[in-house]
Amino acid sequence: FGHYYNFYLMGETLWNDGNNLDLAEIHSQGLEVLMFDTYEDMYGEDASYIEYAQLMNLVDSVLQGCAEDEFQQAVFEDPDMPLDEMNLLHAQIYQDYMGYPLVYEWVDIHHHFETPFYYVSYATSAVSALELWADALENRDKAMQIYDKLTQYTINVEYLETLKEVGLSDPFSSDCVQRVAQALNDEMQLSGKPGSKAA
C-alpha cells in the first residue's frame, strides 16, 4: 500500500527511469511498520506475535540484502567463476550472515539476472523503515510526518539527500544501525520469547 499511496500523491506524474527505487522500498516497508498500531484491532491477542514476525522479516531483509549484494559483487569481480564455486561462495556468505548455508537458492532470485545490485536496496530500505518504527515508538505523530514527507519524493531525487531532507538517517551509518538494533532489543527483548515486550 505504500507504493499505492505514493502513486496517489504523484497524481499525473508517471514512473520513469528517474525514479528512486530505494525510496520506493521505504514507502512500502515504512507503511508496514506504521500500521503496527492497528494490529490489535485486526489480530487481537495475536497482534504482538505478528508485529514480532514483521520486525524479524525486516531484520531478515537487511541480512539477506547484504548477503546477496556481497555475492553479486564477488561474482561480477570474477565473471569466469565456475558454477560450483558460485554455489560454494553463496553457501559461505549465507553461513556468515544467517548462520546456515544456502547453496543453490541464489538462482531463484531474478534480481541477480535482471537488476544486478538492486537487491541491497531491500536492506537499506529496511534499515530506514526500522528507523521510522523506532521514531514512532518515541513520537508516532512525528514519524507519520516523516513518512508523509518521504512519500512526496520519488522522481529525480538523490537517495541520501532525500533521507536527510525528511529527517531520516543515512542507513549506511553505524549510528543509525546501532540505534535501530537497540530499539529492536529494547522493544522486543530479543533474548526472550516472541511477543514478550518489556513492561
Feature roles, as predicted:
Residues 13-24, 114, 118:
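Alpha-helix N-cap/helix-initiation motif
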Residues 1-14:
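Catalytic Zn2+-binding segment of zinc metalloproteases
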Residues 11-19, 50-57, 76, 109-110:
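Short beta-alpha connecting loops at secondary-structure transitions
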Residues 18-46, 54-55, 60, 125:
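Post-HExxH zinc-binding segment in Zn-dependent metallohydrolases
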Residues 9, 35, 39, 136:
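Active-site catalytic pocket residues across diverse enzymes, especially alpha/beta-hydrolases
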Residues 13, 20, 42-49, 174-177:
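Short, structured coil/loop segments at alpha-helix boundaries
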Residues 3-5, 30, 41-42, 61, ...:
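C-terminal, non-catalytic "cap/extension" segments appended to globular domains
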